A protein has these predicted regions:
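Alpha/beta enzyme core
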Residues: 2-59, 68-198
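The substrate-binding groove and active-site-proximal loops of carbohydrate-active enzymes
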Residues: 63
């Protein structure tokens, strides 16, 4: 199985992987932060014109400039499914409940054969306990699994309190498979501003 990499970003490169004998391809992830940021950015530009009167040429932004990339991602899943005969596995990266069920369904509707839920979370809030984080992730798996019919694989971090117990909870919540482990990113600290950098 070809894991997520730049090779899945173009159909011709993915086709070469298939011709070389891979049995499935995992898409790069659609990130929660990306969806939130781009949605807020779109709202910002749609609600503010560069001129203050409606007759101005640039009163409303050019709609083509603000295409939300989740749509591009879904189109890419559909394009890979048309170009390849091997399974295409979509990937969502996020930790909060809510819109994920919609995006999971949309990735399934675009033709993905399975979905990888990549749950990488950097705890920066001292008021959130390890138990809170694990509960949040188990709830997210249950919510996403209830929204789709395709298999759900869950990619986890090695930094949980008890890997056997946590993975058992994920399977009980609906995970059909587990991916061990996520690539580790560490937050950095801005010592001048005394802020955590993500």
């Amino acid at each position: 199985v070809a894991s997520a990499s730049p090779l899945s970003q173009k159909a011709d490169r993915a086709k070469k992987l298939e011709e070389a004998g891979i049995s499935a391809i995992v898409m790069y992830s659609l990130f929660e932060e990306q969806i939130i940021h781009e949605s807020l950015e779109l709202d910002h530009y749609l609600n503010r014109g560069s001129n203050s009167f409606a007759e101005a040429v640039s009163y409303l932004p050019d709609g083509g400039m603000y295409g939300i990339s989740p749509e591009k991602y879904l189109n890419h899943v559909a394009g890979l499914k048309k170009a390849l005969t091997i399974p295409v596995i979509g990937s969502l990266n996020g930790v909060s409940k809510g819109g994920w069920t919609d995006y999971a369904r949309r990735i399934e509707d675009a033709g993905a054969d399975a979905l990888e839920l990549n749950m990488y979370y950097i705890p920066t809030d001292i008021n959130i306990t390890s138990s809170d984080i694990e509960d949040m992730q188990v709830d997210l798996v249950a919510e996403v699994k209830s929204a789709i019919k395709i298999p759900l694989a869950v990619k986890i971090s090695p930094f949980v309190t008890s890997i056997p117990t946590f993975t058992k909870r994920l399977v009980e919540a609906g995970a059909d498979g587990l991916v061990l482990f996520n690539r580790f990113y560490q937050p950095d600290f801005d010592l001048d501003e005394l802020e955590i950098l993500h």
